[in-house]
């Protein structure tokens, strides 16, 4: 079984002020991942949100200054700090886990390296039982 891993980004699970175009593109990528998973049974495709990673992409926010509104201060603080953000090792481990779990567990799903309990038997069991879990949709809206 082939594996494809995509990277999500900020604004996919919460509003991301001043970055709406970026967020909409990443949300589209999440949905595309789910649709390809549904249409391609011999492919394990999943998407991973790495969290804040110190990379050059953040220089654009710093360059924008006050136009980036509250994001400027937040990014500047993180870039100036000793906090390295999410490590490449953690991101790689999550990607390896998603590939190893295969389509039954990871296929079409959106994982957070930082906030999800990936790598645990409990989550793997839940994902096997709930095809809607960790996917982009209105979910459980029929409760009374």
Predicted regions mapped to residue ranges:
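Catalytic loop of short-chain dehydrogenase/reductase
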Residues: 1-41, 49-55, 59-65
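C-terminal helical subdomain
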Residues: 47, 67-144
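Residues at the starts of beta-strands that form the adenosine-phosphate
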Residues: 44
């Amino acid at each position: 079984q082939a594996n494809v891993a995509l990277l999500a980004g900020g604004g996919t699970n919460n509003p991301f002020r001043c970055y709406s175009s970026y967020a909409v593109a990443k949300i589209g990528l999440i949905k595309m991942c789910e649709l390809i998973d549904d249409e391609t049974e011999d492919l394990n495709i999943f998407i991973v949100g790495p969290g804040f990673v110190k990379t050059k992409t953040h220089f654009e926010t710093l360059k924008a200054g006050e136009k980036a509104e509250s994001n400027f201060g937040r990014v500047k603080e993180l870039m100036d700090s000793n906090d390295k953000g999410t490590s490449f090792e953690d991101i790689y481990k999550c990607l390896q886990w998603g590939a190893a779990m295969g389509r039954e567990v990871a296929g079409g799903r959106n994982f957070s390296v930082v906030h999800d309990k990936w790598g645990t038997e409990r989550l793997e069991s839940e994902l096997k039982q709930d095809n809607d879990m960790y996917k982009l949709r209105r979910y459980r809206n029929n409760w009374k």
